[in-house]
């Protein structure tokens, strides 16, 4: 199925690209989320008419994400958790806990924007947590886990 991308999609293409993808990916993900439209002749013409508007909106989203990244990169968040004598936590700190702590500090953050490639954090100490705010904008914030 051939579609026109209405925004940048990771591992697929940029705004305005015509890409050939599997039908299920288009019907179940890209089309319902408004990230693409079917590449018919009238949709191509409609897209070209709206191209400048879509590019401006994409640039604004990226600028907003870069501003958030600048704020978050300077942020140090401290979380308290129950831990044993050797610093091993009773439980773990996951993406939801980190997002809630950052949001409580006054910087709204969604759980889906937090990246923990090695899984949940299970020890006390300092950690650099990756935050993915936009397809082109990624930053890290410092997280300190202390025993309560």
Curated annotation (Swiss-Prot):
Coiled coil: none annotated. Keywords: Ribonucleoprotein, Ribosomal protein, RNA-binding, rRNA-binding. One of its GO terms (molecular function) is structural constituent of ribosome. One of its GO terms (cellular component) is ribonucleoprotein complex. SUPFAM superfamilies: L9 N-domain-like, Ribosomal protein L9 C-domain. One of its GO terms (biological process) is translation. It comes from the Bacteria. It holds the Pfam family Ribosomal_L9_C. InterPro entries: Ribosomal_bL9, Ribosomal_bL9/RNase_H1_N, Ribosomal_bL9_bac/chp, Ribosomal_bL9_C, Ribosomal_bL9_C_sf, Ribosomal_bL9_N, Ribosomal_bL9_N_sf. Gene3D superfamilies: Ribosomal protein L9, C-terminal domain, Ribosomal protein L9, N-terminal domain. Signal peptide: none annotated. Binds to the 23S rRNA. HAMAP family: Ribosomal_bL9 (MF_00503). Belongs to the bacterial ribosomal protein bL9 family. This is Large ribosomal subunit protein bL9. It comes from Pseudomonas paraeruginosa (strain DSM 24068 / PA7) (Pseudomonas aeruginosa (strain PA7)). The gene is rplI.
């Amino acid at each position: 199925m051939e579609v026109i991308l209405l925004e940048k999609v990771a591992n697929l293409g940029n705004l305005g690209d015509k890409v050939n993808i599997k039908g299920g990916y288009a019907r179940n993900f890209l089309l319902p989320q408004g990230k693409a439209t079917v590449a018919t002749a009238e949709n191509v013409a409609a897209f070209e008419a709206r191209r400048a508007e879509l590019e401006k909106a994409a640039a604004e989203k990226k600028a907003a994400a870069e501003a958030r990244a600048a704020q978050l990169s300077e942020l140090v968040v401290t979380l308290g958790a129950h831990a044993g004598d050797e610093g091993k936590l009773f439980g773990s700190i996951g993406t939801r806990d980190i997002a809630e702590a950052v949001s409580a500090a006054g910087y709204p953050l969604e759980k889906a924007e937090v990246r923990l490639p090695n899984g949940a954090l299970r020890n006390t100490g300092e950690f650099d947590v990756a935050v993915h705010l936009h397809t082109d904008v990624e930053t890290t914030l410092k997280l300190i886990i202390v025993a309560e």
